Amino acid sequence: MIGRIAGTLLEKNPPHLLVDCHGVGYEIDVPMSTFYNLPAIGHPVTLLTQQIVREDAHLLFGFATATERNTFRELIKITGVGARMALAVLSGLSVPELAQAVTMQEAGRLTKIPGIGKKTAERLLLELKGKLGADLGHAPGATPLADSAVDILNALLALGYSEKEAAQAIKQVPAGTGVSDGIKLALKALSKG
């Protein structure tokens, strides 16, 4: 199994890459979240990978983070979700956005992704519940923070907090709070321990 590729980026044409690793060119498909963070052609690149071997093909998928790769692995375990659909999900939603959609049971967010219908979205919500790490949920009846929760989560992750710590702190932020104030409140909650 190929778990990581480090080499020189030779080509990039969404979602396909060609990475030269000591004279061997590896064709790798990546989600758009990884694609947008790639260096320029000719520069070094390192990707975590998932290799899928089928009767008719050997496929290699690349990811910028372990969280993305782990989410991809969870997605392809779901009946009816293949590697291409999993890649589409990760291209349409970031991992924190997907975790929030699962926690809030927002099938509508998933059906906006090309190739995902209502039944598939509902299956994804059911199968992924409790498997994505960051629990961005709120108490029943509480108003969700919506997209600001994702921005707050990303800020806390960038500051070095774990997904679990960040998610717990976000629960302390009242609904309707802006991103800037939400970050301050979450940091205050984290400092109280």
Curated annotation (Swiss-Prot):
SUPFAM superfamilies: DNA helicase RuvA subunit, C-terminal domain (SSF46929), Nucleic acid-binding proteins (SSF50249), RuvA domain 2-like (SSF47781). Coiled coil: none annotated. Its main location: cytoplasm. Signal peptide: none annotated. Residues 151-193 are annotated as: Domain III. Keywords: Cytoplasm, DNA damage, DNA recombination, DNA repair, DNA-binding. GO terms for molecular function: ATP binding; four-way junction DNA binding; four-way junction helicase activity. Transmembrane segments: none annotated. Residues 1-64 are annotated as: Domain I. CDD domains: UBA_RuvA_C. GO terms for cellular component: cytoplasm; Holliday junction helicase complex; Holliday junction resolvase complex. Residues 145-151 are annotated as: Flexible linker. GO terms for biological process: DNA recombination; DNA repair. Gene3D superfamilies: 5' to 3' exonuclease, C-terminal subdomain (1.10.150.20), DNA helicase RuvA subunit, C-terminal domain (1.10.8.10), Nucleic acid-binding proteins (2.40.50.140). It is found in: Cytoplasm. Residues 65-144 are annotated as: Domain II. InterPro entries: DNA_helicase_Holl-junc_RuvA_I, Hlx-hairpin-Hlx_DNA-bd_motif, NA-bd_OB-fold, RuvA, RuvA_2-like, RuvA_C, RuvA_C_sf. The RuvA-RuvB-RuvC complex processes Holliday junction (HJ) DNA during genetic recombination and DNA repair, while the RuvA-RuvB complex plays an important role in the rescue of blocked DNA replication forks via replication fork reversal (RFR). RuvA specifically binds to HJ cruciform DNA, conferring on it an open structure. The RuvB hexamer acts as an ATP-dependent pump, pulling dsDNA into and through the RuvAB complex. HJ branch migration allows RuvC to scan DNA until it finds its consensus sequence, where it cleaves and resolves the cruciform DNA. Belongs to the RuvA family. Homotetramer. Forms an RuvA(8)-RuvB(12)-Holliday junction (HJ) complex. HJ DNA is sandwiched between 2 RuvA tetramers; dsDNA enters through RuvA and exits via RuvB. An RuvB hexamer assembles on each DNA strand where it exits the tetramer. Each RuvB hexamer is contacted by two RuvA subunits (via domain III) on 2 adjacent RuvB subunits; this complex drives branch migration. In the full resolvosome a probable DNA-RuvA(4)-RuvB(12)-RuvC(2) complex forms which resolves the HJ. Has three domains with a flexible linker between the domains II and III and assumes an 'L' shape. Domain III is highly mobile and contacts RuvB. This is Holliday junction branch migration complex subunit RuvA. It comes from Cupriavidus metallidurans (strain ATCC 43123 / DSM 2839 / NBRC 102507 / CH34).
